[in-house]
Amino acid sequence: MEAPAERALPRLQALARPPPPISYEEELYDCLDYYYLRDFPACGAGRSKGRTRREQALRTNWPAPGGHERKVAQKLLNGQRKRRQRQLHPKMRTRLT
């Protein structure tokens, strides 16, 4: 009589699938190549501020058409904060004023 391991072997071979065919890109590029393609600076010196394509995409106002609104809102908040500080701690008077 056959051993259980010998009987299970043909079933395992039938269940095992052949590896998927490798595409042209996967055959051509390895992990390091993909890293350089993704993270290499987008353009020449001086134009990208030393940022990679990925960093530029992460830190851009392009998706928000009103990206300048953040700057305007920050100016308003800073002005309100300064006004409150002046009310809490008025400037000391000097003899010159």
Curated annotation (Swiss-Prot):
A GO BP entry: cellular response to starvation
Annotated GO CC locations: nucleus
Signal sequence extent: none
Subcellular locations according to the entry: Nucleus
Entry protein name: Nuclear protein 2
Bias-annotated ranges (Basic residues): 80-97
Function: Acts as a transcriptional repressor by inhibiting gene expression at the NUPR1 promoter in a p53/TP53-dependent manner in cancer cells. Involved in the G1 cell cycle arrest, and in a decrease in cell viability and cell proliferation. Plays a role as a negative regulator of the protumoral factor NUPR1.
Keyword Transcription regulation: yes
Keyword vocabulary terms for this entry: Cell cycle, Growth arrest, Nucleus, Repressor, Transcription, Transcription regulation
Span list, region Disordered: 76-97
Main location group: nucleus
Induction of the gene: Up-regulated by p53/TP53 in cancer cells. Up-regulated by DNA damage stimulus or starvation.
The keyword Repressor appears for this protein: yes
Pfam family, one: Phospho_p8
Family membership noted in the UniProt record: Belongs to the NUPR family.
